[in-house]
Each structure stands twice: as C-alpha cells, then as structure tokens.
UniProtKB/Swiss-Prot annotation:
Record-stated family: Belongs to the PAPS reductase family. CysH subfamily.
Protein's name according to its UniProt entry: Adenosine 5'-phosphosulfate reductase
Organism the protein comes from: Bacillus cereus (strain B4264)
Binding positions for [4Fe-4S] cluster per the UniProt entry: C120, C121, C203, C206
Pathway named in the protein's UniProt entry: Sulfur metabolism; hydrogen sulfide biosynthesis; sulfite from sulfate
Locations listed in the record: Cytoplasm
Catalytic activity: [thioredoxin]-disulfide + sulfite + AMP + 2 H(+) = adenosine 5'-phosphosulfate + [thioredoxin]-dithiol
Record-annotated active site: C229 (nucleophile)
Amino acid sequence: MLTYETWEENVVSFSEEDETKGALSVLNWAYKEYKDEVVYACSFGVEGMVLLHIINQVNPSAKVVFLDTNVHFQETYELIQKVRERFPSLNIIEKQPELTLDEQAKLHGEKLWESNPNLCCKIRKILPLEKSLVVEKAWISGLRREQSETRKHTKFINQDHRFQSIKVCPLIHWTWKEVWRYVYKHSLPYNPLHDVGYPSIGCEKCTLPVGDGGDSRDGRWAGKVKTECGLHYQ
C-alpha cells in the first residue's frame, strides 16, 4: 500500500483517455488500494457534484466528510440534503469543530473570520479534518490545476505533508467548462449560488460573488492576502 511513509513518485500511472479525464481510473485505484481507509473531503461545490457522481459508480457506500463550520450558506446545507436523496448509500458525515461559535467568540473575540481568518479556518476546518484523517490512509479532493497558481502543479496522487497522508486529486485536468458540461449531462444537483456569481463557495462570512472576468477564487476572503483555507498547503 502506498502511504505517506512509503511514498514514491510516479509508482502508478492512469489513462486519461475517457470522459472523466482519468478521474474514474484514479478513483478505482484509490478504493482498491485503500478500501475503507480513504475519505472524500467534500465542500459541495460544483466539482464535488462531479466527484460524488463518479465515486458513487466506483464505491456506492464511500465515506464523504463535510467540514461543517456552522457558518456555511443555507443553500449549501440544502444541497447536502439533495445529494443524500440522489446518492442515498453514500456515507456523508458532517464533521463539527470542537468549539461552537459562542465558545470561539468567548476565547478569541467576535467575528474571528474578520480579525484572524487563518485561526478561524484552523479551528473550524483544519483541525476537524485532521481528526477525520487520523483513521484514514488517504483522502480525496476536488482540486483542479486550472483553479489557481497554488494548485497548478497538483498531481493525481500527492504526498500531503500538511496532514501526513496521501491526497488523491482525480479532477486535476478538468476545466471549468468541462465540470459544468458533466453536471448538465448527468442532471446533477448543484448550489444555486453558482448561478449568481459564486464560482467558489465557502463559508458565508468569507465568500463574495465574483465579477465578470474575475478569477474563480477572487470571492474567497476578498480584501485579504489569504486565498486558501489551509487544507491544501504542501
């Protein structure tokens, strides 16, 4: 088994000559390699809808973890319910932070997402994912190379130093248009905020719509240097 500790570069290759541009091959390999010791960390963005559809074909009872920060858009929570109805056998786990919003405010002040967004992300996203990955050998992410400069070198299989795990990224070669083409072709549910200028959807407090021609992640932590929540730092 390929693990963080036994990591070797390029030990496996995947065919990209199909509708999924390698994603189906990558997921077949991941579930064969790790069986029930791999989890998909899903934010329920539009890429997530594609991955959930393909994962459901490969492993209908796969584990899916949603990092519920308690400050997501209502539309996101409603989408999760639609996904549960569409893929009833998937094991969707809503992972909560250790601190409630009230407890966080007492310790660190009100609106931590404004005063210290990095700490807020650590408390409400990074630490919960760390706890989820303790019992896993690998995790799956919907990163695409096209999304940003920080993601353009992502590979199908990555040694993840942040979580000391294997990070599997099946959608690295997909474009934004290809993601949407797949969603429409398979009549997949998606967050309606995508239709009103939100290409990337995170927490309600830190996500704004993006104007025409803007980068897909310009709406995340707008006005701050921060562009990533910290889950994908290498």
